[in-house]
A protein has these predicted regions:
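Membrane-water interface segments at the C-terminal ends of transmembrane alpha-helices
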Residues: 22-29, 76, 141-172, 200-206
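Membrane-embedded alpha-helical segments of multi-pass transporters/permeases
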Residues: 16, 20, 24-32, 37, ...
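Hydrophobic alpha-helical transmembrane segments of membrane transport/permease proteins
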Residues: 16-69, 165-186
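Short hydrophobic, aromatic-rich alpha-helical segments embedded in or entering the lipid bilayer
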Residues: 48-80, 275-286
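Alpha-helical transmembrane segments of integral membrane proteins
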Residues: 2-3, 101-134, 150, 177-329
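Charged, compositionally biased N-terminal leader segments and the immediate start
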Residues: 1-29, 242
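Residue-level recognition of pore/gate-forming positions within transmembrane alpha-helices
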Residues: 12, 20, 116, 143, ...
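An internal, D/E-rich "acidic patch" concept
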Residues: 62-120
Length: 329
């Protein structure tokens, strides 16, 4: 097991290096740069800048340098712990991300726990009661969950809450707690607002994971070892939970790698629609304004989450299924 983990850890630096190059290329791919977008905004408002000012700002931000040189300087700062300064916000990137990281973690972990706590029991219940009323009900629910965009669900619930109850369900705090210092009352207010975004963001993942769990468990229930275990006199519920469920979890565990970045992004569109103070809307603003240092840092952070998530899923898979450890060794 230790050798298996060490092999995965040795790959991390190379993967992060490759992902950093990809992230930088992605933020450099659109035509123009931050100053181009800023000048366009000034022109739309009837203002303008002198050519000398533009050249001075381009030199100040390093936008006049070759792309490879910009990349090495960017990575050099990151390796020393300096994430740089946002061109749009004119503030250190570490401060901007730090301000939103706590709420992003709360929303992301809440969504993750909600998704797994609901999806796995639904999948087990549907598979063990195949073609029952509950199986059909959850199948329809899963289809709706997969087919309905999460931002559409958010818009519908926001409309219902405002039209019939006269309340706004946007944001994570009431108006009086938005800028207030942390206190017990502010935590309670956060929890009162947090559950709805968690449910909205978790519906899609719950539906997908429940379908995967049901399909995998049905395959396991048909295998010969189940008949042998029944012949030994094991109770059906204990039999299902001890062997097939554990094996059916393997594909779900393997999804952690790509699911983790999605959780921490908080679904950019949903977070923007609901005005959630998470990292997702900040990434959207950085991409629109072509704030390459802020956008690149956030994208690299998501890629690191994908790498870490894949490592976690590999370790969990090796723990759940000893055959994986034996094959690697």
């Amino acid at each position: 097991m230790l050798i298996y983990i060490m092999k995965r850890l040795l790959l991390l630096p190379f993967l992060l290096l490759i992902f950093s190059v990809i992230a930088f290329i992605l933020i450099q791919a659109p035509p123009g740069d931050f100053l181009t977008s800023y000048i366009a905004e000034l022109a739309a408002s009837g203002s303008s800048m002198e050519r000398a000012q533009i050249d001075a700002l381009r030199a100040l931000y390093g936008l006049d340098q070759p792309m490879y040189l910009q990349y090495f300087k960017w990575m050099g700062r990151i390796l020393t712990g300096d994430l740089g300064v946002s061109l749009d916000w004119q503030r250190p990137i570490s401060e901007l991300i730090g301000e939103r990281m706590g709420l992003t973690l709360a929303l992301g972990m809440g969504t993750f726990v909600f998704t797994w706590l609901i999806a796995i029991p639904i999948g087990i219940f549907s598979a063990t009661r195949k073609y029952s009323f509950f199986d059909y009900f959850f199948t329809v629910f899963n289809y709706f969950g997969v087919a309905t965009p999460t931002f559409m669900t958010a818009l519908v619930l926001m409309w219902i809450a405002f039209k019939y109850y006269g309340v706004s369900i946007t944001g994570l705090f009431s108006a009086e707690y938005i800028d207030a210092p942390w206190s017990w009352d502010r935590v309670v207010d956060l929890l009162q607002h947090l559950w709805l975004p968690v449910v909205i963001l978790g519906l899609d993942g719950t539906a997908r994971l429940a379908r995967v769990m049901r399909a995998n468990l049905l395959d396991e229930l048909k295998k010969p070892y189940m008949e042998m275990a029944r012949a030994k006199g094991l109770s059906e519920w204990r039999l299902v939970m001890k062997y097939p469920v554990r094996l059916a979890l393997n594909p779900l565990v393997s999804t952690i790698g790509w699911y983790l970045p999605l959780i921490f992004s908080g679904s950019v569109i949903v977070a923007t629609v609901m005005n959630l103070p998470t990292i997702g809307p900040m990434l959207l603003r950085a991409l629109i304004s072509q704030d390459m240092f802020l956008a690149g840092t956030i994208i690299l952070f998501y890629m690191m989450l994908a790498v870490v998530g894949t490592l976690i899923s590999d370790i969990l898979l090796a723990w759940l299924d000893p055959r994986i450890r034996l094959d690697e060794e």
